[in-house]
Amino acid sequence: MQISPIAPELIRLENIYVHRDERDILKNIDFSLHQNEIVTLIGPNGAGKSTLIKILLGIIFPNKGKVIAKKKLKMAYVPQKFNPSHSLPLRVCDLLDLEKCSATLREEIIQDTGISKLQTAKVQQLSGGERQRVLLARALLRQPDILVLDEPMQGLDIQSEAELYEYVRSLPERYGCAILMVSHDLQWVMQGTQRVVCLNKHICCSGLPESVQQHPEYLAIFGGQRVPYQHHHDHCAHGDHVEQCNHIDHPHIHPEPEA
Protein backbone atom coordinates (compact mmCIF):
# COMPACT_ATOMS: atom_id res chain seq x y z
CA MET A 1 0.00 0.00 0.00
CA GLN A 2 1.43 3.35 -1.02
CA ILE A 3 1.32 6.00 1.69
CA SER A 4 0.49 9.50 0.45
CA PRO A 5 2.55 12.37 1.83
CA ILE A 6 0.81 14.59 4.34
CA ALA A 7 -0.59 17.71 2.70
CA PRO A 8 0.35 21.14 4.07
CA GLU A 9 -1.59 22.20 7.15
CA LEU A 10 -3.95 25.15 6.67
CA ILE A 11 -5.28 25.70 10.18
CA ARG A 12 -4.89 24.08 13.59
CA LEU A 13 -6.78 24.39 16.85
CA GLU A 14 -4.91 23.51 20.04
CA ASN A 15 -6.58 22.77 23.38
CA ILE A 16 -9.62 24.95 22.65
CA TYR A 17 -12.12 25.69 25.44
CA VAL A 18 -15.27 27.80 25.17
CA HIS A 19 -17.42 28.64 28.21
CA ARG A 20 -20.75 30.46 28.12
CA ASP A 21 -23.02 31.13 31.11
CA GLU A 22 -20.97 28.78 33.30
CA ARG A 23 -21.39 25.98 30.76
CA ASP A 24 -18.75 24.21 28.70
CA ILE A 25 -19.58 24.64 25.01
CA LEU A 26 -16.30 23.17 23.78
CA LYS A 27 -13.52 21.57 25.76
CA ASN A 28 -10.07 20.26 24.93
CA ILE A 29 -10.48 20.56 21.16
CA ASP A 30 -7.47 19.64 19.03
CA PHE A 31 -8.25 19.83 15.33
CA SER A 32 -6.42 20.50 12.07
CA LEU A 33 -7.34 20.82 8.41
CA HIS A 34 -4.96 20.17 5.53
CA GLN A 35 -4.81 21.29 1.93
CA ASN A 36 -7.28 19.51 -0.41
CA GLU A 37 -8.74 17.49 2.47
CA ILE A 38 -12.46 16.74 2.82
CA VAL A 39 -13.54 16.57 6.46
CA THR A 40 -17.07 16.21 7.80
CA LEU A 41 -18.13 17.34 11.26
CA ILE A 42 -20.98 15.40 12.87
CA GLY A 43 -22.61 15.40 16.29
CA PRO A 44 -25.94 15.82 18.08
CA ASN A 45 -27.74 19.13 18.52
CA GLY A 46 -25.94 21.24 21.10
CA ALA A 47 -22.63 19.48 20.47
CA GLY A 48 -20.82 22.76 19.72
CA LYS A 49 -20.51 22.37 15.94
CA SER A 50 -21.61 25.95 15.19
CA THR A 51 -19.28 27.30 17.85
CA LEU A 52 -16.35 25.37 16.41
CA ILE A 53 -17.09 26.74 12.93
CA LYS A 54 -17.27 30.30 14.30
CA ILE A 55 -13.85 29.86 15.90
CA LEU A 56 -12.36 28.60 12.64
CA LEU A 57 -13.88 31.55 10.77
CA GLY A 58 -12.57 34.01 13.36
CA ILE A 59 -16.07 35.18 14.33
CA ILE A 60 -15.56 34.36 18.00
CA PHE A 61 -12.52 33.63 20.13
CA PRO A 62 -12.04 30.76 22.58
CA ASN A 63 -11.66 31.30 26.31
CA LYS A 64 -8.57 29.13 26.18
CA GLY A 65 -6.37 27.61 23.49
CA LYS A 66 -4.66 28.58 20.24
CA VAL A 67 -5.77 29.00 16.64
CA ILE A 68 -2.82 28.72 14.27
CA ALA A 69 -3.53 29.47 10.60
CA LYS A 70 -1.53 29.69 7.41
CA LYS A 71 -0.59 33.24 6.43
CA LYS A 72 -3.17 34.96 4.24
CA LEU A 73 -5.56 32.05 4.67
CA LYS A 74 -8.77 32.59 2.68
CA MET A 75 -11.96 30.99 3.91
CA ALA A 76 -15.46 30.95 2.45
CA TYR A 77 -18.63 29.92 4.26
CA VAL A 78 -21.93 28.63 2.91
CA PRO A 79 -24.50 29.02 5.72
CA GLN A 80 -27.35 26.65 6.41
CA LYS A 81 -29.82 29.52 6.12
CA PHE A 82 -29.64 32.81 4.24
CA ASN A 83 -32.69 35.05 4.38
CA PRO A 84 -31.97 38.58 3.13
CA SER A 85 -34.57 41.22 3.90
CA HIS A 86 -37.31 41.69 1.30
CA SER A 87 -36.89 45.44 1.79
CA LEU A 88 -33.47 45.18 0.13
CA PRO A 89 -33.96 43.72 -3.39
CA LEU A 90 -30.88 41.71 -4.31
CA ARG A 91 -30.41 39.96 -7.65
CA VAL A 92 -28.23 36.89 -8.00
CA CYS A 93 -25.80 38.78 -10.25
CA ASP A 94 -25.49 41.52 -7.60
CA LEU A 95 -24.60 38.94 -4.96
CA LEU A 96 -21.98 37.34 -7.19
CA ASP A 97 -20.52 40.76 -8.10
CA LEU A 98 -19.43 41.13 -4.48
CA GLU A 99 -16.63 38.65 -5.23
CA LYS A 100 -13.93 39.79 -7.63
CA CYS A 101 -12.43 37.18 -9.95
CA SER A 102 -11.71 36.57 -13.62
CA ALA A 103 -14.59 36.41 -16.08
CA THR A 104 -13.48 32.91 -17.09
CA LEU A 105 -13.64 31.55 -13.55
CA ARG A 106 -16.95 33.26 -12.92
CA GLU A 107 -18.54 31.71 -16.01
CA GLU A 108 -17.13 28.28 -15.18
CA ILE A 109 -18.55 28.32 -11.67
CA ILE A 110 -21.91 29.70 -12.83
CA GLN A 111 -22.19 26.87 -15.34
CA ASP A 112 -21.01 24.20 -12.89
CA THR A 113 -23.50 25.21 -10.20
CA GLY A 114 -26.38 25.43 -12.67
CA ILE A 115 -27.32 29.04 -11.98
CA SER A 116 -26.85 30.63 -15.41
CA LYS A 117 -30.59 31.26 -15.81
CA LEU A 118 -30.91 32.78 -12.34
CA GLN A 119 -28.68 35.83 -12.83
CA THR A 120 -31.48 38.41 -12.87
CA ALA A 121 -33.67 36.61 -10.32
CA LYS A 122 -34.09 38.12 -6.87
CA VAL A 123 -32.35 36.10 -4.18
CA GLN A 124 -35.42 36.39 -1.94
CA GLN A 125 -37.54 34.59 -4.55
CA LEU A 126 -35.29 31.57 -5.07
CA SER A 127 -36.22 28.10 -3.93
CA GLY A 128 -34.16 26.53 -1.15
CA GLY A 129 -32.13 24.47 -3.61
CA GLU A 130 -31.53 27.42 -5.94
CA ARG A 131 -30.41 29.61 -3.07
CA GLN A 132 -28.01 26.92 -1.87
CA ARG A 133 -26.40 26.70 -5.32
CA VAL A 134 -26.07 30.49 -5.57
CA LEU A 135 -24.38 30.65 -2.18
CA LEU A 136 -22.02 27.85 -3.16
CA ALA A 137 -21.13 29.70 -6.37
CA ARG A 138 -20.43 32.90 -4.48
CA ALA A 139 -18.19 31.05 -2.02
CA LEU A 140 -16.18 29.46 -4.83
CA LEU A 141 -15.71 32.83 -6.55
CA ARG A 142 -13.76 33.87 -3.46
CA GLN A 143 -11.16 31.21 -4.40
CA PRO A 144 -10.81 30.02 -0.81
CA ASP A 145 -8.18 27.80 0.76
CA ILE A 146 -10.95 26.36 2.95
CA LEU A 147 -14.61 26.04 2.01
CA VAL A 148 -16.97 25.56 4.96
CA LEU A 149 -20.39 24.08 4.14
CA ASP A 150 -23.13 24.02 6.77
CA GLU A 151 -25.73 21.33 5.91
CA PRO A 152 -25.37 21.88 2.14
CA MET A 153 -27.76 19.05 1.20
CA GLN A 154 -30.69 20.61 3.03
CA GLY A 155 -33.63 21.52 0.78
CA LEU A 156 -32.38 19.53 -2.22
CA ASP A 157 -34.20 16.74 -4.02
CA ILE A 158 -32.51 13.35 -4.41
CA GLN A 159 -31.03 14.04 -7.86
CA SER A 160 -29.73 17.48 -6.88
CA GLU A 161 -28.27 16.04 -3.69
CA ALA A 162 -26.38 13.37 -5.65
CA GLU A 163 -25.05 15.96 -8.12
CA LEU A 164 -23.94 18.27 -5.33
CA TYR A 165 -22.27 15.33 -3.59
CA GLU A 166 -20.20 14.55 -6.69
CA TYR A 167 -19.47 18.22 -7.34
CA VAL A 168 -18.26 18.90 -3.80
CA ARG A 169 -15.97 15.88 -3.95
CA SER A 170 -14.37 17.29 -7.13
CA LEU A 171 -13.60 20.72 -5.65
CA PRO A 172 -10.28 20.02 -3.88
CA GLU A 173 -8.69 18.75 -7.08
CA ARG A 174 -10.25 21.41 -9.32
CA TYR A 175 -9.83 24.49 -7.14
CA GLY A 176 -7.22 23.45 -4.59
CA CYS A 177 -9.42 24.03 -1.56
CA ALA A 178 -10.00 21.97 1.55
CA ILE A 179 -13.61 21.31 2.53
CA LEU A 180 -15.08 21.24 6.02
CA MET A 181 -18.69 20.19 6.04
CA VAL A 182 -21.24 20.06 8.84
CA SER A 183 -23.80 17.39 8.02
CA HIS A 184 -26.47 15.19 9.56
CA ASP A 185 -26.67 13.13 6.36
CA LEU A 186 -24.79 10.02 7.45
CA GLN A 187 -25.12 8.48 3.99
CA TRP A 188 -23.09 11.36 2.52
CA VAL A 189 -20.75 11.54 5.48
CA MET A 190 -19.74 7.92 5.25
CA GLN A 191 -19.33 7.82 1.47
CA GLY A 192 -18.19 11.29 0.49
CA THR A 193 -15.55 12.31 2.99
CA GLN A 194 -11.99 11.39 3.84
CA ARG A 195 -12.17 12.06 7.56
CA VAL A 196 -15.05 12.23 10.00
CA VAL A 197 -14.87 14.22 13.24
CA CYS A 198 -17.56 13.33 15.78
CA LEU A 199 -18.15 16.20 18.21
CA ASN A 200 -20.08 16.28 21.47
CA LYS A 201 -18.52 19.31 23.20
CA HIS A 202 -15.26 17.39 22.91
CA ILE A 203 -13.97 15.34 20.00
CA CYS A 204 -15.39 11.89 20.67
CA CYS A 205 -13.63 10.20 17.78
CA SER A 206 -12.00 11.07 14.49
CA GLY A 207 -10.73 9.17 11.49
CA LEU A 208 -11.80 7.24 8.44
CA PRO A 209 -15.59 6.80 8.19
CA GLU A 210 -15.30 3.03 8.51
CA SER A 211 -13.37 3.32 11.79
CA VAL A 212 -15.56 6.05 13.28
CA GLN A 213 -18.71 3.97 12.76
CA GLN A 214 -17.27 1.32 15.07
CA HIS A 215 -16.28 3.70 17.87
CA PRO A 216 -18.28 3.32 21.14
CA GLU A 217 -18.99 7.07 21.43
CA TYR A 218 -20.29 7.24 17.86
CA LEU A 219 -22.54 4.25 18.59
CA ALA A 220 -23.78 5.89 21.80
CA ILE A 221 -24.75 9.10 19.95
CA PHE A 222 -26.19 7.68 16.74
CA GLY A 223 -27.72 4.49 18.11
CA GLY A 224 -25.75 2.10 15.96
CA GLN A 225 -26.71 3.68 12.64
CA ARG A 226 -24.38 2.20 10.07
CA VAL A 227 -23.93 3.13 6.46
CA PRO A 228 -21.98 0.87 4.07
CA TYR A 229 -18.65 2.61 3.59
CA GLN A 230 -17.36 2.89 0.04
CA HIS A 231 -13.72 3.81 -0.35
CA HIS A 232 -14.09 6.43 -3.08
CA HIS A 233 -10.70 8.06 -2.71
CA ASP A 234 -6.99 7.48 -2.76
CA HIS A 235 -6.55 10.07 -0.01
CA CYS A 236 -7.66 12.74 -2.43
CA ALA A 237 -11.03 13.82 -3.80
CA HIS A 238 -11.01 12.38 -7.27
CA GLY A 239 -10.82 9.19 -9.27
CA ASP A 240 -14.45 8.11 -9.35
CA HIS A 241 -16.54 6.98 -12.29
CA VAL A 242 -19.59 9.21 -12.55
CA GLU A 243 -22.10 9.57 -15.33
CA GLN A 244 -21.34 12.80 -17.14
CA CYS A 245 -23.23 15.15 -19.43
CA ASN A 246 -21.95 15.38 -22.99
CA HIS A 247 -21.21 19.11 -22.79
CA ILE A 248 -19.40 19.23 -19.46
CA ASP A 249 -16.78 16.61 -18.67
CA HIS A 250 -16.58 17.06 -14.91
CA PRO A 251 -19.02 16.82 -11.99
CA HIS A 252 -21.50 19.70 -11.90
CA ILE A 253 -25.03 20.54 -10.80
CA HIS A 254 -27.98 20.69 -13.16
CA PRO A 255 -30.41 23.62 -13.00
CA GLU A 256 -33.74 22.86 -11.38
CA PRO A 257 -36.44 22.08 -13.97
CA GLU A 258 -38.63 25.03 -14.85
CA ALA A 259 -42.13 24.96 -13.40
Curated annotation (Swiss-Prot):
- Domain ABC transporter, chain residue ranges per copy: 11-225
Entry GO terms, CC: plasma membrane
Q: How does it sit in the membrane?
A: Peripheral membrane protein
Q: Which GO terms describe its biological process?
A: response to zinc ion
Q: What keywords does the record list, in alphabetical order?
A: ATP-binding, Cell inner membrane, Cell membrane, Ion transport, Membrane, Nucleotide-binding, Translocase, Transport, Zinc, Zinc transport
Keyword tRNA processing annotated: no
- Where, per UniProt, does this protein localize? Cell inner membrane
Q: What is the predominant subcellular site recorded for this chain?
A: membrane
* EC number(s) reported in the record: 7.2.2.20
Q: What does this protein do?
A: Part of the ABC transporter complex ZnuABC involved in zinc import. Responsible for energy coupling to the transport system.
Protein name from the UniProt record: Zinc import ATP-binding protein ZnuC
